[in-house]
Amino acid sequence: MEKYERIRVVGRGAFGIVHLCLRKADQKLVILKQIPVEQMTKEERQAAQNECQVLKLLNHPNVIEYYENFLEDKALMIAMEYAPGGTLAEFIQKRCNSLLEEETILHFFVQILLALHHVHTHLILHRDLKTQNILLDKHRMVVKIGDFGISKILSSKSKAYTVVGTPCYISPELCEGKPYNQKSDIWALGCVLYELASLKRAFEAANLPALVLKIMSGTFAPISDRYSPELRQLVLSLLSLEPAQRPPLSHIMAQPLCIRALLNIHTDVGSVRMRRAEKSLTPGPPIASGSTGSRATSARCRGVPRGPVRPAIPPPLSSVYAWGGGLSSPLRLPMLNTEVVQVAAGRTQKAGVTRSGRLILWEAPPLGAGGGTLLPGAVELPQPQFVSRFLEGQSGVTIKHVACGDLFTACLTDRGIIMTFGSGSNGCLGHGNLTDISQPTIVEALLGYEMVQVACGASHVLALSTDGELFAWGRGDGGRLGLGTRESHNCPQQVPVAPGQEAQRVVCGIDSSMILTSPGRVLACGSNRFNKLGLDHLSLDEEPVPYQQVEEALSFTPLGSAPLDQEPLLCVDLGTAHSAAITASGDCYTFGSNQHGQLGTSSRRVSRAPCRVQGLEGIKMVMVACGDAFTVAVGAEGEVYSWGKGTRGRLGRRDEDAGLPRPVQLDETHPYMVTSVSCCHGNTLLAVRSVTDEPVPP
């Protein structure tokens, strides 16, 4: 097992435990079947050996790939391909009563057909073909058949006599005790096709005798007449009572119904969707970016390009801009010819996630690498430069979200696994110690949960699971972990949340935390200095008396300041001494300290009451991010505004402090939409994507 790292138990097979593991050599997720051979009967050991023998013979994209087998602690370990999309049975169950399109049914069916043809070509019977043994890739587009534990290799005999398989898929000849050959697998194939078309099994009954009676009589409900007569006839032929009347696989593949789907499999699966620049058929003036006609749900630009658009040069897939920390205007970061869909800023880190699931980092070049010295007579400091790189050693992992704290980073994979790296001070990495780690390492305490989001504060972390379970770790003073104490923890702790408050999103600040719940309400904990969490119980424009001011909350508490406690909130973010929120109607509210104008009001008032940002009336806001003493907000049409403290480029322009929102100019010549924004201390990262008429793949 030195080559593998166990992640979690994902199931129990016919004869043993099934583990999801990480192969250390290439960081690829694999399945390890652990079969305790010493506790097995002779027949069971033969079945386990048979599975290895069968898997070694097969090599097909629609069959689960075999890697190796070895002995470990008196158990046979079989390493094989991991299919992250679950089983076809689970896919069908999630459809409820929503029937699949015929094209989708055939897309799945012909892949099963190809896999079974490959198996039969090697003189192997599957003998347990069912939707539970048909697996899907992560995009749920490619199917793979697996579980050959009871397969039979036909060496010299043409028929097998043992009765095995799942009862609902057993053929009539097996019910009669007759010998069978490949036609029994074709019966099971018909059962799978029927299940795809009707979302239920062809043969079901309360007990085994009743089930056998149904199978022997061939009694099953017809599939919906929304499907073509050819598909309905194919189901009937596959489920013929007489094995000789069931068509062989080669005949099924030759049917006109299947030919187009088979051609699509060979031409479309695995193809790379390309973007192309549309060339105008007739010369004409450039089209303004607001008149492209494309629609986007994210923040989208409506301005006119600064120059003529040259259709021969396609726009970049995306751009990431950075400002602050000495950058007085947005600097476009190098992109490595990829599309970044989400960004996160830390005290020193700049990170992003690409559409393909890779983690990209932007770093300052080492001293002496060029561009870092002034020429004689120069009066201005050179603009800082950055180099981009992909995080190495994660080739088998798909990242879907990243968050940054002070000198540490957390990332979330598409399988719901959280990995952390960087500084281990305050226990922020969640590994049960304070050790620094340079490479992303799995937070083992959360492997039993499927996580959907992670957020980092300066020195603490919140993580949310698919079932709404909340975990926190790191520094705990001020009650920022929401655990009811001020204690710190170097390992994830489950956070109690009041019943009915289903968490949808988590947010971390310097010394506080928030969770956004399903009805658009917000709970907060930690330091409430200046009422930056909105925990004071205030009516509109009311100021609390000193003894009513809430200075900190050790547990997650509903906001009490109007209108935050009344209007549904879509987005919230926490700065050092202030916070911001966007309501369902697109209004932006700020609360907390206004020392540097970060609340966006005309007067530098000293108030604990939330205020609506001035100057954004009539603009629907969709995103907001808070830095140490400034705020950045994004409108539905892609407008970017900033306000607050302006030193060291915090506002993305050469202004000093600005108490009211002003636009930030991005160097974009094509229509764009803002996909992500992140502020930390005095830095901002913002990602935009070019808007084209062609849809972007999910």
UniProtKB/Swiss-Prot annotation:
Tissue: Kidney, liver, and testis.
Catalyses which reaction(s): L-seryl-[protein] + ATP = O-phospho-L-seryl-[protein] + ADP + H(+); L-threonyl-[protein] + ATP = O-phospho-L-threonyl-[protein] + ADP + H(+)
Molecular function per GO: ATP binding; metal ion binding; protein serine kinase activity; protein serine/threonine kinase activity
Presence of keyword Electron transport: no
Pfam families: Pkinase, WD40_RLD
Annotated stretches, region: Disordered: 278-309
Chief subcellular location: cytoplasm
Gene Ontology biological process terms in this record: animal organ morphogenesis; determination of left/right symmetry; heart development; regulation of hippo signaling
Keyword DNA-binding: no
EC assignment: 2.7.11.1
Keyword vocabulary terms for this entry: ATP-binding, Cell projection, Cilium, Cytoplasm, Cytoskeleton, Disease variant, Kinase, Magnesium, Metal-binding, Nucleotide-binding, Phosphoprotein, Repeat, Serine/threonine-protein kinase, Transferase
Subcellular location: Cytoplasm; Cytoplasm, Cytoskeleton; Cell projection, Cilium; Cytoplasm, Cytoskeleton, Microtubule organizing center, Centrosome
RCC1 repeats: 416-467, 468-519, 520-585, 586-637, 638-690
Active-site residues (renumbered): 128 (proton acceptor)
Record's subunit section: Interacts with PKD2; may regulate PKD2 targeting to the cilium. Interacts with ANKS6. Component of a complex containing at least ANKS6, INVS, NEK8 and NPHP3. ANKS6 may organize complex assembly by linking INVS and NPHP3 to NEK8 and INVS may target the complex to the proximal ciliary axoneme. Interacts with ANKS3.
Protein family per UniProt: Belongs to the protein kinase superfamily. NEK Ser/Thr protein kinase family. NIMA subfamily.
Function: Required for renal tubular integrity. May regulate local cytoskeletal structure in kidney tubule epithelial cells. May regulate ciliary biogenesis through targeting of proteins to the cilia. Plays a role in organogenesis and is involved in the regulation of the Hippo signaling pathway.
The protein, known as: Serine/threonine-protein kinase Nek8
Gene: Nek8
